[in-house]
Amino acid sequence: MDKIIIKGAQFMCNIGASKGERAKKQNIVVDAELFLNLSKASSTNDIRHTINYLEIHSLMKDIAEKKEYKLIETLAENIAIGILKNSSIKKVVVRIKKPMALAKKNVKYAAVEITRN
């Protein structure tokens, strides 16, 4: 199975377990691995046979920024569901990093990774 990788997409969203944490937008970083058959795209050199990266980015941005979330797990699930609505994509891995989650503890980020198909 082939894959397309979108790595390091940054969005500002209201996310956090407490109401206070959700009061101010926070930076999150999203990686997505999209598994699909790319043989027709590679043999024809035709964009119509692949996935438009900008559309996937816009989808992730809309999901992340238009709703409030308590958990990055929920956000990851919603992004995966949105991506899988494209019938060409057979499997997706979504990683979400929350850099400020443990910043006071000198931790680079907290993260979640889910795989859906």
Set out the residue ranges of the language-model regions.
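N-terminal, polar/charged subdomain of small-to-medium soluble alpha/beta proteins
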Residues: 1-117
